[in-house]
Amino acid sequence: MLVHIPNVLTPEQVSMLRDRLDRAGDAWVDGRATAGYTGAPVKRNQQIAEHSPVARELGDVILAALERNPLFISAALPNQVYPPLFNRYEGGMTFGSHVDGAVRVLPNGVKLRTDVSVTLFLSAPDEYDGGELVIEDAYGVQQVKLPAGDMIVYPATSLHQVTPVTRGVRVASFFWVQSLVRSDAQRALLFDMDTAIQRLNASGADTEACRSLVGCYHNLLRIWSET
């Protein structure tokens, strides 16, 4: 399940993050530092050092925005969110096809299962050529290039890549979510049900029927969730 979440950040927030990242200097390091065994050979980009002050400061801005975003909560059903990271592609940089590692270690040593991968775009599409996020899923190959401030949420099990950036600079944040529901198929069903419930409520549909659907939703979540 791929979900496009628009306007996660305001234009003012995007501008602030870009300004801080553009002035980050030595905090930008070789992106291979965080790649796994199979990812490192095909990864050519730069990242903000994972535990640097700028990464924590800007990551907190994103985490606060996620807490206020009902579409993200509905789609990802977050249990734990990995602190957001930041990357930059320019001058032909790319990240070849790979699958994200199954487990990440949080700063406090707790292990996080990567159920959901997230990319938050911080560059406008007309700022760069190339740089599409290409995701292979059960429905084929999806190419993603979103407005600055928009986000794509997709299963971490997906084979994906970032195509070479041939002009300009592509800046983004990326991170992972351990969901309350590890199965993508189950999350997709719950997301569709939640979306339908919201539409029925907005249309003034029969409230008793809506209450019944809400009960079904929460009972399925109770069966499938892991806390």
From Swiss-Prot:
Domain Fe2OG dioxygenase, chain residue ranges per copy: 80-179
Residues binding 2-oxoglutarate: 170
EC number: 1.14.11.-
Gene Ontology molecular functions: 2-oxoglutarate-dependent dioxygenase activity; iron ion binding; L-ascorbic acid binding
Record key words, sorted: Dioxygenase, Iron, Metal-binding, Oxidoreductase, Vitamin C
Entries under Pfam families matching the protein: 2OG-FeII_Oxy_3, PKHD_C
GO biological process, one term: intracellular iron ion homeostasis
Cofactor: Fe(2+); L-ascorbate
Domain of life of the organism encoding this protein: Bacteria
InterPro entries according to UniProt: Oxoglu/Fe-dep_dioxygenase_dom (IPR005123), PKHD_C (IPR041097), PKHD_hydroxylase (IPR023550), Pro_4_hyd_alph (IPR006620), Pro_4_hyd_alph_FE2OG_OXY (IPR044862)
Cofactor notes: Binds 1 Fe(2+) ion per subunit.
Class of this enzyme: oxidoreductase
Residues engaged in binding Fe cation: 98, 100, 160
Entries under HAMAP family matching the protein: Hydroxyl_YbiX
Protein name in the entry: PKHD-type hydroxylase BamMC406_5004
Protein source organism: Burkholderia ambifaria (strain MC40-6)
Lineage summary: Bacteria, Pseudomonadati, Pseudomonadota, Betaproteobacteria, Burkholderiales
